[in-house]
């Protein structure tokens, strides 16, 4: 028989803090109990459930507000990437999730790998791209990227400097 557990933390694919769940014995024995993410349900832990659910509701409201604020910030933000390309404008490598996270961090936007869909493996073409992000509490947002060749950026800077010299 699978044991009934009280989750102390949110666990992806299983439940939220304060939920009573049933999981496979190996998952319970090897992951949930040693990591402190759950306890075996008993009369004492069931009293703890109400307190955990109340805390979860407060945290959920704060997380949703933070996610909505982040989504509003992302609406007006475009992350610009310069990449090396060959003579046929094929990129060397790709713009990875880690690259996106670091550039967003430089712009003051905090993202994590959890925000990106699992299927997203990186941007491998030049141009404008939109990536759907999954934020906390079911809030979604679009992240706008512009991937340009490094020689295009150098040409734009030259044109700007020439225009400034003419003025």
UniProtKB/Swiss-Prot annotation:
One of its GO terms (molecular function) is structural constituent of ribosome. The keyword rRNA-binding applies. Disulfide bonds: none annotated. Pfam families: Ribosomal_L9_C (PF03948), Ribosomal_L9_N (PF01281). One of its GO terms (biological process) is translation. Coiled coil: none annotated. InterPro entries: Ribosomal_bL9 (IPR000244), Ribosomal_bL9/RNase_H1_N (IPR009027), Ribosomal_bL9_bac/chp (IPR020594), Ribosomal_bL9_C (IPR020069), Ribosomal_bL9_C_sf (IPR036791), Ribosomal_bL9_N (IPR020070), Ribosomal_bL9_N_sf (IPR036935). One of its GO terms (cellular component) is ribonucleoprotein complex. PROSITE patterns: RIBOSOMAL_L9. Keywords: Ribonucleoprotein, Ribosomal protein, RNA-binding, rRNA-binding. Belongs to the bacterial ribosomal protein bL9 family. Binds to the 23S rRNA. This is Large ribosomal subunit protein bL9. It comes from Chlamydia muridarum (strain MoPn / Nigg). The gene is rplI.
